[in-house]
Amino acid sequence: MTELGDDPDVEALAAARREEALATNQRRLLVLAGDRDAGIDAAFDAVRGADVPDDEVTFVTAREGFRFHRVEPKRASSLLGTTRTLVVLDAHEEFSANALGRVAGAVDGGGLLVLLTPSLDDWPTRRDSFDERLAVPPFSVADVTGRFRGRLVSTLRDHPGVALVDLDSGTVERDGAYRQGISFDAAPPRVPTEKDRRSPRRAYEDCLTADQSEALAALEALTEPGTAVVVEADRGRGKSSAAGLAAGSLAAEGKDVVVTAPGERNAAEVFARAERLLSELGALRGGGAGDFDIAADRGGRVRYVPPTEAGDAAADADALVVDEAAALPVGLLESFLAAPAVAFCTTVRGYEGAGRGFTVRFRDRLDDADREVTDARLDDPIRYAAGDPVESWTFRALLLDARPPVDQLVADATPETVSYRALSPDDLLADEHLLREAFGLLVLAHYRTEPDDLARLLDAPNLTLRALTHEGRVVSVALLAREGGLDPDTRRQMYDGGRIRGNMLPDVFTSQLRDEGAGVPVGYRVMRIATHHAVRSSGLGSRLLTELRDEFADDADYLGVGFGATPELLSFWRDNGYGTVHLSTTRNDTSGEYSALMTRPLSSAGRDLRDRHANWFLGRVGDVLGDALSDLDADVARAALAAVDSFLSPDLSEYEWRVVVGASYGPGLYTTAPGAFRRLGLAHLTNPERASLTPREERLVVRKVLQTHPWDAVADELDFHSTAGAMRALGDAYEPLVDEYGTDAAREERERFR
């Protein structure tokens, strides 16, 4: 520790670290800990010592009045894709892990990241607006812990390349010198000979590294139908730029290229690079990157289409480029295979989050598709040299490099060999390997895991983590959120439309489904559940859910879950004792899926909650399927209805039975009394074991009777030769339903046609 007296020479320290950063083309981190006003003054000294022009400096702070470019912490995402020489992050008031990751990603090689913090000894005990967001009802901010900040502080104190000044004591705790670090400049790009490339020479000349030029070469496979290219990279490696160069090259040849991503912002770099290349080639004819629609010579085009529409749009295009593919669900990724040629580009580890799930969740399906698959990976950073200590610190501090155990260590795990255990935040902090394995599995359980998720896991009072371990290695995890147990004022606020954080199921039950008592029972919602990919489909997920049921039987009224509905997931949760109580009436913007809510009672209060919502669901679902859910996938509807823990009686009048019998066994028409067919169809679909219908017949009931699709559309979708054939098939499908549910009057009517 170096004594600096009453006036620490931050200027000299910043100058030294800046000189080192420039010499290695890496970044350095300077922490100014202590009084906030003193920290801001010291940050100005750091800017002066680093000799950075004002227009290359950004302050990320809630404070105003600086001569530098300023960004509010809640808008830190605006720095993604930008490059700054020096960024100051004020962590005193509105600090979040997400903001830290996004800010760090904006610092260029040779630059400095300056972090203003409270005293490092006191910081973990401080609470700010982020902690207030973690304090979801019925908890208060006093229940939020400071474990995440405590872990962050420990990394600041021992990671290479981090200079640390204690402003309160006037000392340099660490000077951050990192001269022993090895810096490697990326290999220069390679330009293939004309006979070895399809893309223009200029596209290769625009590449910045050999990795990028090799990725562009791999993307040339998109010129041929029946191909797929997978491009993976950590953030900052030029993946999106390579995709943009490929898209621009295709457009210059007159190709129609569809680009999709979770949002337009995610695809901005693809369009910027495509526009620049087309301009350099003299082939730009209209539109632009800002419009996300670029016109080129010979009818070429690069255009953005939202993920839920991209599969259909790409089927008529020449190629589809998917950026940030890991942030999209498997169902959408599969729909993209309708394109003649498709590129899946994804960030494996990035400052804004991690997305390794693409490889685990989708790669097997891609390999099984009738595609010639080309792989490319970019490892060399674009904006700074390899071995950058700020990158390695950020990955470590935010667990962006967390991974599950290697396959060999868990491949022989079975439900009989595993142990169930609670993973408390203190357990996780005491064992870095345990933390990395558990968090690594949680990353794979979701399309996009943010740095804030780590802070929530360690500090949020409503979250709890459970796991199955095999010989000490984590093979399955479940993250649960405690919900409900709300006081009357909170329940009334929710009923009146107020949004209550962290209580998803009670919120939907109360505000949307008008059940003011739904916030009284205590439930645990399974937010994420994941099993190691090496031992999937071996019963471990079900074993974990059984353990959860047994553990929480005396502490909660129900277990619940909400997810993007697919037939497979609905069946999985049904097999584990969960019943459908609601289907959302709007699709998720990113996944294109409708959400299903399911519960499993643990007490009489939980059973009452389940029973009334199951019955209300059955009372409305027939109408909703013919309206807001008229485009719900038929197999999702079948699985959702089969999972309802209640049976619907058809309750037909004698006249209605005569109509149904006449349409199934005789010459009658379905259109005479569609309501009777709807009730009988719902009775079967909520208890499909009672009568034997084929999956195709059940889809016919869903599409025509429940969703009222036109006959010609139904016949086409279900591969009937004609509408008349579909009509006859519907009558045939109702024969076993008449046999199973029919009254004496129905059976008597049936005998007239035998």
From Swiss-Prot:
Keyword GTP-binding recorded: no
Residue segments, region Disordered: 181-202
Protein name: tRNA(Met) cytidine acetyltransferase TmcA
Gene that this sequence comes from: tmcA
Observed phenotype of the null mutant: Mutants lack the ac(4)C modification, but do not show any growth defects.
SUPFAM superfamilies cross-referenced by the UniProt entry: Acyl-CoA N-acyltransferases (Nat), P-loop containing nucleoside triphosphate hydrolases
Binding annotation for ATP: 212, 236-245, 383
Subcellular location: Cytoplasm
Domain N-acetyltransferase, first and last residues per copy: 418-603
GO BP term (any one): rRNA acetylation involved in maturation of SSU-rRNA
Source organism per UniProt: Haloferax volcanii (strain ATCC 29605 / DSM 3757 / JCM 8879 / NBRC 14742 / NCIMB 2012 / VKM B-1768 / DS2) (Halobacterium volcanii)
Record function comment: Catalyzes the formation of N(4)-acetylcytidine (ac(4)C) at the wobble position of tRNA(Met), by using acetyl-CoA as an acetyl donor and ATP (or GTP).
Reaction equation(s) it catalyzes: cytidine(34) in elongator tRNA(Met) + acetyl-CoA + ATP + H2O = N(4)-acetylcytidine(34) in elongator tRNA(Met) + ADP + phosphate + CoA + H(+)
HAMAP family linked: tRNA_acetyltr_TmcA
